[in-house]
UniProtKB/Swiss-Prot annotation:
Domain PAC: 348-386
Name of the protein this chain belongs to: Aryl hydrocarbon receptor
Induction text: Induced or repressed by TGFB1 and dioxin in a cell-type specific fashion. Repressed by cAMP, retinoic acid, and 12-O-tetradecanoyl phorbol-13 acetate (TPA).
Ranges where the PAS domain occurs: 111-181, 275-342
Cell compartments where the protein resides: Cytoplasm; Nucleus
Expression tissues: Expressed in all tissues tested including blood, brain, heart, kidney, liver, lung, pancreas and skeletal muscle. Expressed in retinal photoreceptors.
Species this protein is from: Homo sapiens
SMART domains: HLH, PAC, PAS
Stretches with biased composition (Polar residues): 1-10
């Protein structure tokens, strides 16, 4: 046993693909007589006919050798005999009338569909092993878990699939008493391949327990050979089933008598580690391809044909397998290819494969190198389709470094000449003289002919340009994304060429600069001369027949084209009028229509209005004793309103040229004495800290200046105030100048209408009066009024300003063209009266 255990072998794909049979033409001189050849031809014909009757796909049948055809034929007949007995179907039912045949075929079709669905829902595969360790039956789903096809394991020794350390345990589970050492029959021998006793003991059914006995149930774990993407090469499987009689085999003993049915293990093998949800969803789409060592496809299973759409002949006759890989993924796959050649496994990689309908599908792949006689023989690639979102996520995480080392010769297999045609060159090399496109095409053709057919760039050149320029994907937004990576891969290849030094005669990477026209650019660049050299291609003809222009493709690439709003309509209901009104109020509060004059220039003005000012001051002195209490409280209210509205600093960003309609509600003519006592200048004003910081300004209308007439209904008077020219005099910020500017004459003879009252307050206070209602406020501190004193410099400036009579101010045409007269001009006070009386608000028309 020890000597034979050294020659332990595992299951592998031993059969070779038979040479395709071709019918030779009959020679003209006639058929030569060769009995042995005629016998071989007749035998091959019968074997081909027998193979066509097997219940396997045609691609599996084409790969079977003669011994495999005979082996599978015997196993199929044995399985059919078992089911005939198990299902108790009589020959009369099978050979009945036409109606019975139709009903039987219908039931058979239903049963077949039900069985397929059950196998798909099962997390594992079905395995039937006889007591002599032969695989009686294995379901087709064994390929999804172990990588072996159904035809590879049927009627083969099960020990070729089992790990050497688990074979003894598996043999013990095959015995009904879990004690195979009791088999001391003369037929017992030693199997050379496994080193285990090969028992041929036949039991009488009366000597063993019945089928429904608990002693016949089995549940154990062993490791099976796995060709899929696991590092150890074995997969731990859980076997759960029972020993049952295998009917209908009709085996004969040594004396020629028919032996009774023998026991066999009917079990379901499931992976010990349960699969994830993702594996459950995608396990039915896993397909496998077989390649040569240079990645040339030589086979594909049925699921691969469904996913990719190619037939096996189309895959195997196109040459290098890199023709089916996206250009942006070629270098990435080539790196994994070299890793697999060195280590025997590529690891999990994600890339794009080209389907038959010119679509790119993302797959997760793992390649394994299989050996024969100690030498690499071929490559088995297991691939699982992915969604576009999963593939894009893997692509963003991919390392974009150069995979090859040019100094060690790893890039020798991938020639790096520049064979790109004008339409595919992502970064054309422009020459000084600017050669034409025809010369470039000729150079490209020569470079393409000089390429090694098995090189990476040769495979890229054999791809159709339309799969990158016009990808037939479900969403057009993926086109720029794919072309972007395609151009990046082209640039990487070109960088390889630029950085490569000669290494030898035949093993160097050749670099040839191809002259390209300057109007040729990449697809994503949107150059005006794009695709000029492709107008004679078949692709251009197809697009012309479909009515598609290259300009349409440019619009499809532009993502902004899909996001533009071409309605051009503005819904005024979407405009927030509240913000506009508040903005206008704030602007009106922060702008002054009157600009003061300079204090230095006021003293140099001529004294032409002394009579008017003296009369004004005389009237103020007469009324100061009667209106002292009336003035103090409104003045405090005015300061409180200014503090509440926070008008400090609101007059900085104003524009005197802005047109602002000013609404002035007409009030009943009232006379208020603003300042009755000007001797108390030394007394501290309670709101001086707030008033001094405010750049309050005000100018006055000249004595002979015409004003606007009174409104007919005495409601509101709207007139523009934005065209006043700014005064050349700087603003005053002191409290004295502020107090001085508020004094206006009340009884003046200007020849104007006495019924009209002109209102000249600041714009900010007009807004304050209209937007806030005057409520009685507590009186904090009474301010001693200042009586006019001509000796004071501030008052003297005020007197000189009005005695001159010429203020050099320009007013709108609406004010200059009115010839009304007024005997007395009443000043609308800038503060509120003592009684609680709400002021009328400005109407919305004044703002809108």
């Amino acid at each position: 046993m020890n000597s034979s255990s050294a020659n332990i072998t595992y299951a592998s794909r031993k059969r070779r693909k038979p040479v395709q049979k071709t019918v030779k033409p009959i020679p003209a001189e006639g058929i030569k007589s060769n009995p042995s050849k005629r016998h071989r031809d007749r035998l091959n014909t019968e074997l081909d006919r027998l193979a066509s009757l097997l219940p396997f796909p045609q691609d599996v049948i084409n790969k079977l050798d003669k011994l495999s055809v005979l082996r599978l034929s015997v196993s199929y007949l044995r399985a059919k005999s078992f089911f005939d007995v198990a299902l108790k179907s009589s020959p009369t039912e099978r050979n009945g009338g036409q109606d019975n045949c139709r009903a039987a075929n219908f039931r058979e079709g239903l049963n077949l569909q039900e069985g397929e669905f059950l196998l798909q829902a099962l997390n594992g595969f079905v395995l039937v092993v006889t007591t002599d360790a032969l695989v009686f039956y294995a379901s087709s789903t064994i390929q999804d878990y172990l990588g072996f096809q159904q035809s590879d394991v049927i009627h083969q020794s099960v020990y070729e699939l089992i790990h050497t350390e688990d074979r003894a345990e598996f043999q013990r589970q095959l015995h009904w008493a879990l004690n195979p050492s009791q088999c001391t029959e003369s037929g017992q021998g030693i199997e050379e391949a496994t080193g285990l006793p090969q028992t041929v003991v036949c039991y009488n059914p009366d000597q063993i327990p019945p089928e429904n006995s608990p002693l016949m149930e089995r549940c154990f774990i062993c490791r099976l050979r796995c060709l899929l993407d696991n590092s150890s090469g074995f997969l731990a499987m859980n076997f759960q089933g029972k020993l049952k009689y295998l009917h209908g085999q009709k085996k004969k003993g040594k004396d020629g008598s028919i032996l009774p049915p023998q026991l066999a293990l009917f079990a379901i093998a499931t992976p010990l580690q349960p699969p994830s949800i993702l594996e459950i969803r995608t396990k039915n789409f896993i397909f496998r391809t077989k390649h040569k060592l240079d990645f040339t496809p030589i086979g594909c299973d049925a699921k691969g044909r469904i996913v990719l759409g190619y037939t096996e002949a189309e895959l195997c006759t196109r040459g290098s397998g890199y023709q089916f890989i996206h250009a942006a993924d070629m270098l990435y796959c080539a790196e994994s290819h070299i890793r697999m050649i060195k280590t025997g496994e590529s690891g999990m990689i994600v890339f794009r494969l080209l389907t038959k309908n010119n679509r790119w599908t993302w797959v997760q792949s793992n390649a394994r190198l299989l050996y024969k006689n100690g030498r690499p023989d071929y490559i088995i690639v297991t691939q699982r389709p992915l969604t576009d979102e999963e593939g894009t996520e893997h692509l963003r995480k991919r390392n974009t470094k150069l995979p090859f080392m040019f100094t060690t010769g790893e890039a020798v297999l991938y020639e790096a000449t520049n064979p790109f045609p004008a339409i595919m060159d992502p970064l054309p090399l422009r020459t000084k003289n600017g050669t034409s496109g025809k010369d470039s095409a000729t150079t490209s053709t020569l470079s393409k002919d000089s390429l090694n057919p098995s090189s990476l760039l040769a495979a890229m050149m054999q791809q159709d340009e339309s799969i990158y320029l016009y990808p037939a994907s479900s969403t057009s937004s993926t086109a720029p994304f794919e072309n972007n990576f395609f151009n990046e891969s082209m640039n990487e290849c070109r960088n390889w060429q630029d950085n490569t030094a000669p290494m030898g005669n035949d093993t160097i990477l050749k670099h040839e600069q191809i002259d390209q026209p300057q109007d040729v650019n990449s697809f994503a660049g949107g150059h005006p001369g794009l695709f000029q050299d492709s107008k004679n291609s078949d692709l251009y003809s197809i697009m012309k027949n479909l009515g598609i222009d290259f300009e349409d493709i440019r619009h499809m690439q532009n993502e902004k084209f899909f996001r533009n709003d071409f309605s051009g309509e503005v819904d005024f209901r979407d405009i927030d009028l509240t913000d506009e009104i508040l903005t206008y109020v704030q602007d009106s509060l922060s702008k002054s229509p009157f600009i003061p004059s300079d204090y230095q220039q006021q003293q140099s003005l001529a004294l032409n209005s002394s009579c008017m000012v003296q009369e004004h001051l005389h009237l103020e002195q007469q009324q100061q004793h009667h209106q002292k209490q009336v003035v103090v409280e409104p003045q405090q209210q005015l300061c409180q309103k200014m503090k509440h509205m926070q008008v400090n600093g609101m007059f900085e960003n104003w524009n005197s040229n802005q047109f602002v309609p000013f609404n002035c509600p007409q009030q009943d003519p009232q006379q208020y004495n603003v300042f009755t006592d000007l001797h108390g200048i030394s007394q501290e004003f309670p709101y001086k800290s707030e008033m001094d910081s405010m750049p309050y300004t005000q100018n006055f209308i000249s004595c002979n200046q015409p004003v606007l007439p009174q409104h007919s209904k005495c409601t509101e008077l709207d007139y523009p105030m934005g065209s006043f020219e700014p005064s050349p005099y700087p603003t005053t910020s002191s409290l004295e100048d502020f107090v001085t500017c508020l004094q206006l004459p009340e009884n003046q003879k200007h020849g104007l209408n006495p019924q009209s009252a002109i209102i000249t307050p600041q714009t900010c206070y007009a807004g304050a009066v209209s937007m806030y209602q005057c409520q009685p406020e507590p009186q904090h501190t009474h301010v001693g009024q200042m009586q006019y004193n001509p000796v004071l410099p501030g008052q003297q400036a005020f007197l000189n300003k009005f005695q001159n009579g010429v203020l050099n101010e320009t007013y709108p045409a609406e004010l200059n063209n009115i010839n009304n007269t007024q005997t007395t001009t009443h000043l609308q006070p800038l503060h509120h009266p003592s009684e609680a009386r709400p002021f009328p608000d400005l109407t919305s028309s004044g703002f809108l």
